[in-house]
Amino acid sequence: IAYTYSRSFRTVPGISHDEEYRSPYDRPHCISIVVNYEFSDRFNASANWIYNTGQPITYPYGKFTDHGSTYAIYNGYRNQSRYPDYHRLDLSATWKGKKHKRWQGEWNVSIYNVYGRHNTWAVMFTPGENNTLETKHMYLFSVIPSISYNFKY
């Protein structure tokens, strides 16, 4: 089990009204829990759960259109909001084959992001109806299963 509490702020002249603001690396809470269990000499399983506070982001508060192009309007304060918190569970199981004179093999079955959490990778803002901006969250991965065979000689 690992836990980290960490804050990261920046002050840059001309940004955020010259006031301190959250840096992109400000993720106060990071938790990692890893469990490994060896059922026998030939079979083991593991679980890994990760949680991080969402990354800071600056949301626009309006938009305007000029010559057919739409632009976002920001209030001047940087990183006042956050992405949704990030978390996922990964599972893995490994079966080792019997040792032969010259080599040994093992099968591994893994599942990344077991419960299919849609962790935000990026946020896009698109023009919506009634002169509004719509927020679209982009996700990289959902559940990813894998099977592999490894051998040593």
Q: Can you annotate each of these PLM segments?
A:
Residues I1-P56:
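Gram-negative outer-membrane beta-barrel transporters
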Residues C30-S32, D90, E106:
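Extracellular structured ligand-interaction cores
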Residues F9, S92-T94:
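Outer-membrane beta-barrel transmembrane strand signature
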Residues S16-R22, G76-Q80, T132-H137:
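Extracellular loop and loop/strand-boundary signature of outer-membrane beta-barrel proteins
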Residues R22-P28, R82-Y86, M138-S142:
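Transmembrane beta-barrel outer-membrane domains
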Residues S32-I33, I73-Y74, K98:
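Generic detector of contiguous secondary-structure segments
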Residues S6-S16, H67-N75, T126-N131:
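Flexible, solvent-exposed coil segments and beta strand-coil junctions
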Residues R42, Y51-S69, Y86-R88, W95-Y153:
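C-terminal beta-signal and adjacent terminal beta-strands/loops
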